[in-house]
């Protein structure tokens, strides 16, 4: 065998060995706690989302979807308030320290929610809104000490804000009231 042929044979053998010892890809359900509904933190978050869903439904909003996920992030709840599509972020804090639950939704979180909404809107609109796209409002349900606080219109997507009541737009394109 020539030197080049020998090196090629060794390289192929090494590649075959690596292939044999390669770990199989982890399944999405392989994470700890997946069989029993997630980690304690995830189960707590799901409980608050369920409570927010029930509470908003009692306030007259109609549920459309829950836990919408895409590569940009997740939207906890999608609901309908008359002719407005409402995307809801649910937050909970045991204590009001560091500004509380509502204060934890800063500009970066709003940006992630807006990017997720931009990716998920076509599906939601196709499924629930024939015709012209509705105004899109972001609400926050913040649980502090177990009590819900509803922040209606915490922020709007600029291109989907209602025409009446606009007071301006900040540098990131958010409607400012």
Curated annotation (Swiss-Prot):
GO molecular-function term, one example from the UniProt record: nucleic acid binding
Family affiliation: Belongs to the UPF0102 family.
Protein name: UPF0102 protein BPP4042
Region described as Disordered: 13-43
PANTHER family in the cross-refs: UPF0102 PROTEIN YRAN
Protein origin, superkingdom: Bacteria
InterPro entries: Restrct_endonuc-II-like, tRNA_endonuc-like_dom_sf, UPF0102_YraN-like
């Amino acid at each position: 065998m020539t030197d080049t042929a020998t090196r090629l044979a060794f390289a192929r053998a090494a590649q075959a060995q690596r292939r044999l010892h390669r770990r199989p890809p982890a399944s999405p359900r392989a994470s700890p706690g997946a069989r029993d509904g997630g980690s304690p933190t995830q189960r707590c978050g799901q409980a608050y989302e369920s409570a927010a869903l029930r509470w908003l439904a009692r306030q007259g909003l109609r549920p459309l979807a829950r836990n919408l996920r895409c590569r940009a992030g997740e939207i906890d709840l999608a609901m309908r308030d008359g002719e407005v599509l409402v995307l809801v972020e649910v937050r909970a804090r045991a204590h009001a320290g560091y500004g509380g639950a509502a204060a934890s939704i800063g500009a970066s979180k709003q940006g992630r929610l807006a990017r997720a909404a931009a990716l998920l809107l076509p599906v939601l609109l196709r499924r629930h809104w024939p015709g012209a796209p509705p105004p899109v409002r972001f609400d926050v349900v913040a649980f502090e000490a177990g009590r819900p606080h509803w922040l209606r219109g915490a922020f709007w997507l600029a291109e989907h804000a209602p025409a009446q009541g606009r007071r301006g737009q900040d540098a990131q394109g958010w409607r400012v009231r």
